[in-house]
């Protein structure tokens, strides 16, 4: 992850490198959206295009996924036409099933459990603006998919993450336990509280979110 973020920052800031780097040339990347999307859809389409590929957007009403065709059948069919698939879905089990049955790479563009590309983009922004982060990353909001991957990505990069969630809206404990285990290797800590004031005290970065998911 650190290498990907540093590479992305260099690509963003080096116009000559960006103009000449076309690893997706001749490839078509399909993006399936069960949920409406603004930033995710635009960023994937622009990104694939800039890297030389052809983006193909498939909305839920455009295909038979989950209707007359199963996720596994859809994965097999799309793999014959596409060089990669991104999938923004409701159930995390569906993106796992798609990945298991596809013969091309599959990227989770959002599920109810994870939002990895969002976390990578957030950590990239933090690295760009606070490379010498003095203090922990603070989260105030519900324990949703974005927090799950902020916990994982934050400790991978060696940052302590302290989060405040309302009682009964805590993150998935398996994800928290996984982040704690990763933190033991990187020296980063996960700290939980229900008090937002405590969470933001002495923070280097404060990340807030709504209590009702936008999807």
Label for each model-derived stretch:
Residues 79, 99, 199-201:
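A short, aliphatic-rich alpha-helical micro-motif
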Residues 28-81:
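Active-site cofactor/substrate anionic-group-binding motifs, chiefly glycine-
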